[in-house]
Design a protein with these regions (language model features):
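Pocket-lining segment of extracytoplasmic ligand-binding domains
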Residues: 25-52, 181-183, 191-193, 222
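A structural signal for short loop-to-beta-strand junctions that line the ligand-binding cleft
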Residues: 29-38, 195-212
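Pocket-flanking alpha-helical
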Residues: 139-144, 148, 155-197, 216-219, ...
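Bacterial signal peptide processing site
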Residues: 21-23
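Bilobed "Venus flytrap"/periplasmic-binding protein-like clamshell domains
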Residues: 84-101, 121-149, 154, 212-243
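Hinge/capping helix and adjacent helix->loop/strand transition within the periplasmic-binding protein
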Residues: 43, 47-70, 146, 197-201, ...
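C-terminal motif of bacterial Sec signal peptides marking the signal peptidase cleavage site
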Residues: 16-19
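An extracytoplasmic/periplasmic, membrane-proximal ligand-sensing/linker region
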Residues: 25-27, 41, 55-124
Length: 243
């Protein structure tokens, strides 16, 4: 199962294209044609700078997973968390504090970052996402609960997407960050969108939280495959957002 998760995190499997026909009901609204589709799926992960103390990381991860079942009413994403998936990242090592927590729960991580976490406790700035997005809403709940219950001070910050969040870690403007798993790997290895910038390896993986699916929706009935998008305009997210 861990190999499966690793493959899903490392590779963009396929693109989900939901084709909506140009049929209209009596009200004039467009109605969708429902078909099974495959989906682009990457993991939503939390990263920590290597100078965040092991004790703080341990408390932070424990607060997320130990309280997930009781906090689904605070945010639905808590219901998607699992310890197995949380410990499944193979492309970037975990900090000792996170590795310790998952080991206590019976899950060994693939690798542990040597030298990470050898610092004192401090306030933690957690850069998330745009104010209207899931990263910000979920991250704010995580930060507030950890501050109120875990004995650490975490503040959620608005972010500008995965690539920007990694940059915030490198620049020392945040200690924790939401990121997509593919962007995380690009940064750590200095590939793809980080090829010109160079690798950023001042962080470790705190935990993988849930899978993110990306879908393309169209009202043009002639667009049924990815190839049909040739020459078409597609509305995407902000540069560096991962979408």
């Amino acid at each position: 199962m861990k190999k499966f998760f690793a493959l899903v995190l490392a590779l963009v499997m396929a693109l989900s294209l939901v084709a909506c026909g140009d049929k209209k009901d009596d009200s004039g609204d467009v109605t969708a044609e429902h078909t099974d589709t495959t989906t682009v799926a990457v993991g939503a992960v939390i990263l920590a700078r290597d100078d965040v103390s092991s004790d703080d990381v341990y408390k932070f991860v424990a607060d997320i997973f130990d309280n997930a079942a009781s906090l689904t009413t605070s945010h639905a994403k808590y219901g998607e968390l699992s310890l197995e998936y949380g410990a499944s990242i193979t492309s970037v090592p975990y900090p000792p504090g996170a590795a310790k927590y998952f080991a206590e729960k019976g899950f060994e991580v693939a690798s542990v970052k040597d030298g990470a976490g050898n610092t004192d406790s401090r306030n933690l700035r957690f850069v998330t996402g745009g104010e209207s997005g899931t990263y910000y809403a979920f991250g704010s709940v995580i930060a507030q609960h950890a501050t109120n219950n875990a004995g650490i001070d975490v503040v959620g910050l608005v972010g500008n997407g995965s690539q920007s969040n990694v940059q915030e870690l490198q620049d020392g403007n945040a200690e924790l960050a939401f990121c997509q798993s593919d962007v995380m790997a690009y940064a750590y290895n200095g590939t793809n969108i980080f090829a010109d910038h160079g690798k950023v390896d001042c962080f470790s993986t705190v935990a993988a939280l849930y899978m993110e699916q990306v879908q393309i929706v169209t009202t043009n009935a002639s667009i049924k495959t990815v190839a049909d998008l040739a020459g078409k305009s597609v509305s995407i997210g902000a540069p560096g957002s991962g979408v």
